Structures are given as structure tokens and as C-alpha cells.
């Protein structure tokens, strides 16, 4: 089965709000800052081995842009952004894009299902209760040491080791995560906003990638 590729959009999570429907229902939404994505490069099968659209968004001070990146942006005649992202597209779609052009929020429609990818909030080093929802030990009844202990890590001399993947204390959060099949509630191109029903990964101010849902 041939995989179908589709164009996405890079925005910034602004925070959460709510909108009211015509019948008075309150719908919780996440607001995404959707400033136009600038096309920095078109990748083709002949040159790069695959078809993709490379975009940038936002702005970055010239002092923070190294020479290779500055040359890349200058060649495309686009302002240096805060990063570069790529979206694989079908070969037949490449004719719809041009280097230096813009992709706006109107590629999405109200009611459309989307997948949103972001970096989750970092929680630092956490124990198994917070990290994996382990059950706590008894608060009293003779328990004086193991209130938040994870319990056994394995067996005995055989196998004599802790199996890989064992749930233990460690760094929590700050990983890429996708939330699938969220509904687009509103698209405001003039104000540069997309309202998506429900929560999306990450903290306010973080970059998120919005794509048409892969399982809709």
C-alpha cells in the first residue's frame, strides 16, 4: 500500500479558551498562532530522492543565524525563521508550491479532523507514581518506609538482572507527542488563528505541527 502524504502547517500554541455554539454549548479549544509559513525549498525526486516542501516560520535575529542558514534563506529570498520543517507531499502536488511563497491557515476547514504534534511539558526527574500512575503503598498499618516505593524490580539470581523497559523513576516529559483526530472549530486567516477542539501537546508558546488526520 502506497503511503499518502499531505501538507502540514507549523504554528505556535497560544493557550486555551472556549467558544460557544449556536445552541449555547461551551466548547474548549486550543488556540494556535497560525502566521503564514514561508516556503524555503522545494525538494524533488530527481535532486533529493523524495518530494517535499520545506518551510520556515517566525523570525530570528541575524546575529543568531549562522552563515550556511543565512545563505539558504537568502537563496530562497525569505526572511530567516526560527527553524526549518519539511512536509512530504505527492509528486503531483509540487506544482502548487513555489520557493518564496506562503502557506496560510486556510488549508484547513472548519469541521476537519487534524493531528497535532508538539513537545510535551518537561517534568524533570519523577518517581513511578507520577510518571506511570503506580499505586502508593499504605500510609500506615506498619508501613514506615515504602509509601512511594515502586516495589520489586524483578526476580532473583535467575535472571539476575533488571529487564530492559522496566518502569522506573526517571526523566518525565519533554518528548514529541501527537494527539490525533482533533476537530478544527474555527479558522481566522486575518488574525492568524486556528481554534482546535480539546488539548494539544506542549506548553503555551511552543511550536506545534498541524496535519490532516491520518486515521480520519
Curated annotation (Swiss-Prot):
Pfam families: Ribosomal_L3 (PF00297). GO terms for biological process: translation. It comes from Xanthomonas campestris pv. campestris (strain ATCC 33913 / DSM 3586 / NCPPB 528 / LMG 568 / P 25). The keyword rRNA-binding applies. PROSITE patterns: RIBOSOMAL_L3. GO terms for molecular function: rRNA binding; structural constituent of ribosome. One of the primary rRNA binding proteins, it binds directly near the 3'-end of the 23S rRNA, where it nucleates assembly of the 50S subunit. This is Large ribosomal subunit protein uL3. GO terms for cellular component: cytosolic large ribosomal subunit. Keywords: Methylation, Ribonucleoprotein, Ribosomal protein, RNA-binding, rRNA-binding. Coiled coil: none annotated. Belongs to the universal ribosomal protein uL3 family. The keyword Ribonucleoprotein applies. The modification N5-methylglutamine is found at residue 157. The lineage of its organism: Bacteria, Pseudomonadati, Pseudomonadota, Gammaproteobacteria, Lysobacterales. Part of the 50S ribosomal subunit. Forms a cluster with proteins L14 and L19. Methylated by PrmB.
